[in-house]
Amino acid sequence: MKRIAFVFSTAPHGSASGREGLDALLATSALTEALGVFFISDGVFQLLPGQKPDAVLARDYIATFKLFDLYDIDQCWICAASLRERGLESVNFVVDATPLEPVALRRELGNYDVILRF
C-alpha cells in the first residue's frame, strides 16, 4: 500500500483547510497505517493548546488532534525552524510531534508516495 503524508501548512481558523485535512487524515487512517503527519510553516499553529475559535465564530476542531493515539497515528513531525521563527520552541502541543530541521523533514517527507497538503 502507498505511504501517505499529510502536510499541514496553514494556520487554523482562517480557512477550513486545517479542519478538512484533519477529517481526511482520520478517515484515511481507517484504511491504512502507512501515514505520516507533518506540521510546517503556519501549520505549527494547528497544535497550539488553549485556542479560542469561538471568538472568531469558528468550530473547535483542534481538540480532535488529541485522537491521534486512538486512531494509531504515531508518525508525526513538526518543523523545528518554523517553531523557532514563531517563538514556539517551548510550547506543549496537543499532540506529540517530533521536531525536525528542514533538511531532515524533507528527507522524511521523501519517504512517502502521496503528499496531501492542507
Curated annotation (Swiss-Prot):
Organism listed in the record: Salmonella gallinarum (strain 287/91 / NCTC 13346)
Family that this chain belongs to: Belongs to the DsrF/TusC family.
Gene Ontology annotations for the cellular component aspect, listed alphabetically: cytoplasm
Annotated keywords: Cytoplasm, tRNA processing
Quaternary structure, from the entry: Heterohexamer, formed by a dimer of trimers. The hexameric TusBCD complex contains 2 copies each of TusB, TusC and TusD. The TusBCD complex interacts with TusE.
Name of the gene encoding the protein in the UniProt record: tusC
Cited SUPFAM superfamilies: DsrEFH-like
GO BP annotations listed: tRNA processing
Name this polypeptide is given: Protein TusC
InterPro entries: DsrEFH-like, Sulphur_relay_DsrE/F-like, Sulphur_relay_TusC, Sulphur_relay_TusC/DsrF
Statement: the UniProt record of this protein carries the keyword Cytoplasm: yes
PANTHER family per UniProt: PROTEIN TUSC (PTHR38780:SF1)
Protein purpose: Part of a sulfur-relay system required for 2-thiolation of 5-methylaminomethyl-2-thiouridine (mnm(5)s(2)U) at tRNA wobble positions.
Places the protein is found: Cytoplasm
